[in-house]
Amino acid sequence: MIRGAPAPMAEPPPVVFCHDSPKRVLVSVIRTTPATPPCSSVGEPEPPPPLVPTSPGFSDFMVYPWRWGENAHNVTLSPGAAGGVVSAGLPVAAELPTLRGAPQSSASVAAVSGGEDEEEASSPDSGHLKDGIRRGRPRADTVRDLINEGEHSSSRIRCNICNRVFPREKSLQAHKRTHTGERPYLCDYPDCGKAFVQSGQLKTHQRLHTGEKPFVCSENGCLSRFTHANRHCPKHPYARLKREEPTDALSKHQSPDNKAAAEWLAKYWEMREQRTPTLKGKLVQKADQEQQDPLEYLQSDEEDDEKSGAQRRLQEQRERLHGALALIELANLTGAPLRQ
């Protein structure tokens, strides 16, 4: 090797990996690439021309077209926007650089940030009902908008302190406790004494004393159980949790430390059995049906499978439709500069 100044080596092209696999590369929806300004005779660069959106490329979907349906529900078509922007709600794209070192535009970042809100709003843990009424605690950045909406709303279920409106009277009463600081639901477990604003919070807390874990991972063969519905299985983070009432062997394994705790647990399980007799009746009826007439029981299972299959096919058709609409929008975007 000859000593001297080392020859400059070209840097290898950057490779973007997603989930440790080069096959699933995500790029931003719209990439604005400013043209390199030529240097003037004086030596001062000319002002850069306005940013022109280039070809959207693969947008925020996976590279393979047949996987577009997996994220088609995150597509938002905006024909009224300037230039027509197609946004996709994938927060991963905000963390990844665009290909070929091009900087991300503010439009793509805004699309990603809006997608995060949409994803959180559509998640099962957000508490949306089938009729469109929102439940649960709202996001902190939306409280001001809710207050502004309440000032102009005609609803009578209104908070007299902050003017927020609510779909039901029970929600308003629970909300008012955030102003007064009242916590009427007290845990009566020995030496606990914690108080809560809502009764559901108390029930969730008491599972720590009873050892209940009614939410299980929906992955086949996984035995992970959880106390609350908003947890995620560490082995299967993308699997949903399903509620499964534990058997006596699983639910009553908690060994009390003293006599008072033992009495509290006995009283708790007695009240629990009194509250849920109908659920046990349904489980016993299903077991009896399986033992008495197994053919009829299997037939009912087949009917359930047909219903779930029909729902799955309908969902696939909707995803294909969203994918087709996204393709049409992308074609319009790429063809607009050519027509001009």
UniProtKB/Swiss-Prot annotation:
One of its GO terms (molecular function) is DNA binding. Expressed in bone marrow and ovary. It is found in: Nucleus. GO terms for biological process: regulation of transcription by RNA polymerase II. Keywords: Activator, Coiled coil, DNA-binding, Metal-binding, Nucleus, Phosphoprotein, Repeat, Transcription, Transcription regulation, Zinc, Zinc-finger. GO terms for cellular component: nucleoplasm; nucleus. Residues 101-140, 280-317 are annotated as: Disordered. Residues 127-140, 307-317 have a biased composition (Basic and acidic residues). A zinc finger (C2H2-type) spans 157-179, 185-209. The keyword DNA-binding applies. SUPFAM superfamilies: beta-beta-alpha zinc fingers. The modification Phosphoserine is found at residue 300. Residues 299-332 form a coiled coil. Transcriptional activator. Isoform 1 may be involved in transcriptional activation of erythroid genes. Belongs to the krueppel C2H2-type zinc-finger protein family. This is Zinc finger protein 367. It comes from Mus musculus. The gene is Znf367.
